[in-house]
Each structure stands twice: as C-alpha cells, then as structure tokens.
Amino acid sequence: MHRFITFAAAALSLASCSRAADAPGCLLVPSGYGPEGQVPIRVERVASGLEVPWGLAFLPDGDVLVTERPGRVRLIHGGRLLGAPVASVPVTARGEGGLLGIALDPRFAENRRFYMYFTRAKDGRDVNGVARFTLAADGRSARQDRFILDDIPAARFHDGGRIRFGPDGMLYVATGDAREPPSAQDPRSTGGKLLRITPGGAPAPGNPTPGSPVFLSGLRNTEAFDWLDARTLIVADHGPSGEMGRSGHDEVSVARAGDDLGWPDVWRCEAARGRVAPALVFREAVPPGGGSMYRGDAIPAWRGSFLIGILGSRHLHRVALGADGRVAAHEVYLAGDPPKGLGRLREVVQGPDGALWVTTSNCDGRGTCPAEKDVVVRIVGG
C-alpha cells in the first residue's frame, strides 16, 4: 500500500548528528505542489452551508450521510441537504478533534448500522473512540448503540480519524499520535497507528500480533488510506511541525500488515532497517486530508490513481504509481481558494455514481470561510 507519511528524525539520530541514506524509490518534491493537471474535469455543487464536513457515507438508496466536525450528522436526500441533523453527538470540537470519520457496515442493507470516530470528554480527559449507530428506516434519525473501540489517545491536534471497512470486512481505524510522538512506536498504545478490528470491536483475526488491534505503526496523523489490492495499502500522513526541530515532509507510502512507517524515528526519504520508506515526500508542508483510490468511469484518465485532498496548499493531488510501486506521475488540480479553486479539501472518496466526491474544510479556523460555508462537490470528466 502506498502512503503519504512524514517521517521525523529520531532523537538518537539527532544526538549523533547522523542521517540515514535516502531510499532509492522515494520521490522528493521540493514544494507542496506539483505539475498542473492536464485532464479536463468539471466540478458540480451538491450541498453548501456545512461546517467542516469531515466524512461521507453513501447509502444504498442514493442518500448520503455527512459528518460535521462540531458533532452533527447531516443527510443529503434527493440531491439536497436537509436542515435537521440525523444525529448529534457530544464532542470536544477544538483544534482537530470532534466528529470525524464515518463508515457503513458491510451488511448495512440488513442491519442499518454505521460507525463514527469522534473526540469526547471522558473522566476528565479527552479521548477518541469509535461508536456504532443504527439508522432509522426512514433515514431521518439514528441511535447510538455502543462504543466498539474507546480510549484512543486524543489531543488538540493529531487525532487521525479516518475509518474504512477493508475488502476483508474488517474495520480499519487511523489514529494520530496525539502530540506524543513516542506513542507511534509503542505497541501498547493505540495512538499513531492504523488499527484493524472486527465490526464488534475485537482485534481482527490475522493481525500481526495476536490479540492486538495494531495493523500498522509509526504514523503521526493519518486521514487518508485505501487499498491497492487486498493486501496492500496506500497511506497519506502528516509530516512534523516542529517536533525535534523538524518540519514539512508530508508523505505517501505503500505498506502491508505489520509495517512500521517510521515516525518519529526517521523522516524525509530516509531508509532504515525495519521501516518502510515513503514513495513520495513533499519537502514543504502540504498537509494531506482524505484520500482514495479512483476506479470509476466518470474520469477514465484518473483510473488507478490515488486522489488526495490537500489542506494547507489547497488543491487536489493525483498520484499514479507504476508497476514497481514507484511514483510514475503526480499532478495538481483545483489549486487555490474559491472561485479559482476549492480551498482546503478534506474528504475525497469515489461515490457509487463513479464521480469523485470532495468536501471542503474552509471553515475549520485555518482557511477563509465563505458566506456559503463549506461545501460538498462531485467531480466528473470535463
């Protein structure tokens, strides 16, 4: 699996002033951008008036659930955003925390279940957790059943939050290091990891360490991952922003079960024994939001590419890999703030209609919030 992952230099490496050699297959991009994209595309507005829409879930009847970071679940019905929330959950919506990822149960058509990752106060501290919900038959309300995974480290920044069901039917949960870099290397911590659990919340069978939910380690703050094939992932991760004197170097990497992506021990394109080197590194901070592999027909030239929403440098980034797993091409679309571009991009996911669906994050306190607030759009061929 290819991943965007930023590696920071280890404290030991800093102390000895040594630097690991660069991995030969890693592409270092000197800026936070890339070549201008050449594929004609068209952007269609689906909904506006949202507040930091973080995740999308497509229902079998064509409706779409949208999470808003302040704690609301909204419904797009018949192409229109309904006013009343489907559900509201109590969250700690400060910094990067709040209501984040959402995923439908693989058996949703039978059980109406979906899952959400969010930050909340518990016993005098903030934690992240994954809770299971059941959607009413009319789709207008939902009830919370129970937490299937709880006490994931939380902080003002680095909360991770993307959740997706894999081709194996297991739930994959991306967590942040909660501003405690060593947690990413601590097998006892669920921080700074990609976790793999059953729909009931137990560590999934076949995990690298029996009885542990940890599938990948060495992550800093991942919001984007998808599958290249049934056993290989592509992951995007945020690089350091001052830890150990390091900054920038957001990454895309390819990984498999048990891999260590290196944070905080290595960073940039460095190769190190027992660590997976990234495929692509941005020298200047991007950083990446959500991302997905595109396999649809609406934009044939993008098929087989990893599309990433870029927050800081405000664009959509396409990454194409060659048969050898190295970056064959990468390019930029929709750069800049509206009306030229879309601004800060958060969720990027292929819809059942074959279009690429994208949410903006211009009202998260780090962008310019327009009068229409944040939007949901679909992207098709031009």
Map each language-model feature to its residues.
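Beta-propeller domain segments
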Residues: 22-33, 97-99, 107-109, 177-332, ...
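Beta-strand-rich domains and repeat architectures in extracellular enzymes and scaffolds
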Residues: 44-71, 287-293
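Surface loop/turn motifs at the tips and blade-to-blade linkers of beta-strand repeat domains
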Residues: 45-51, 86-94, 148-155, 213-217, ...
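Conserved beta-strand position repeated across blades of beta-propeller domains
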Residues: 47, 54-57, 103, 164, ...
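Generic structural signal for coil-to-beta-strand starts
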Residues: 63, 72, 113, 170-172, ...
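Beta-propeller domains
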Residues: 65-87
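Blade-loop segments of beta-propeller domains
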Residues: 82-106
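Asp-box/WD-like beta-propeller blade repeats and closely related beta-sheet repeat scaffolds
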Residues: 127-164
